[in-house]
Design a protein with these regions (language model features):
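ALDH superfamily catalytic-core signature
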Residues: 1-95, 117, 157, 219, ...
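Conserved C-terminal structural/oligomerization subdomain of aldehyde/semialdehyde dehydrogenase
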Residues: 84-226
Length: 226
């Protein structure tokens, strides 16, 4: 999860935009993610040369404006001079919060909880169809439920990002997140134009398709239409 969220400082179109976590494992999971962030970027990520920059000042200001200080449980600091924002986790987020109203495209991970799988499924399906969905569960029935019945472009089970790293599978969105796929064979099909052609024989021409449309022609056509 930490890899997928903070790869390129969250500036990928398939970075997790929010984390929907079972309330029973919420505290444990957040603790593990915090540990991993510190392991990857250190205690002072703004000083880490391997930790990236936000692409420009306008984007920096937009992303920083999504941080609610009252909900920060990790990170939250920013340095405008270098266009860096710490890996940030917001906990106790609600669907009405500003950070849930748009694609983040930055190093902020909002965390929400659910009590049942029905609640989790409804939360996802009530929102615009995502480009990617990542399911973390060892239960095959849970995996299949979300893969089969929740609309999304593509994704992973127990991983993030890696579904677009292979040319053997198509990559693309669905509905609000786009239509069509590319990568591998899908690229060839998507960017090729298939021409539909009727090649009519010259030795026969069916006259009833031409005007005037006498009653016998209408009856003849109805035989095939109905």
């Amino acid at each position: 999860i930490a890899f997928g969220k903070w790869l390129n400082v969250g500036q990928t179109c398939v970075a997790p935009d929010y984390l929907l976590v079972d309330a029973r494992v919420h505290d444990e999971l957040l603790g593990l993610i915090k540990e991993e962030v510190r392991r990857m970027f250190g205690e002072h990520p703004l000083d880490n040369e391997d930790y990236g920059h936000i692409v420009n000042a306008k984007h920096f200001a937009r992303v920083r404006g999504l941080i609610d200080p009252d909900k920060v449980v990790l990170g939250g600091a920013a340095r405008e001079a270098s266009l860096k924002i710490e890996p940030t986790i917001l906990d106790g987020v609600t669907p009405e919060d500003a950070v849930m109203q748009e694609e983040i495209f930055g190093p902020i991970l909002p965390v929400l909880t659910f009590e049942s799988l029905d609640e989790a499924e409804a939360f996802i399906t009530d929102r615009p169809t995502p480009l990617a969905l990542y399911i973390f569960s060892q239960d095959r029935s849970v995996q299949q439920r979300f893969v089969r019945y929740v609309p999304f472009g593509g994704g992973c089970v127990n991983d993030t990002i890696m579904h677009l790293a292979t040319s053997h599978m198509g990559f693309g969105g669905m509905g609000a997140s786009g239509m069509g796929q590319y990568h591998g064979r899908e690229s060839f099909d998507t960017f090729s134009h298939k021409k539909s052609i009727v090649n009519k024989a010259t030795w026969l021409d069916v006259p009833f398709r031409y005007a005037p449309y006498a009653s016998w022609k209408r009856k003849f056509v109805r035989m095939f239409v109905h």
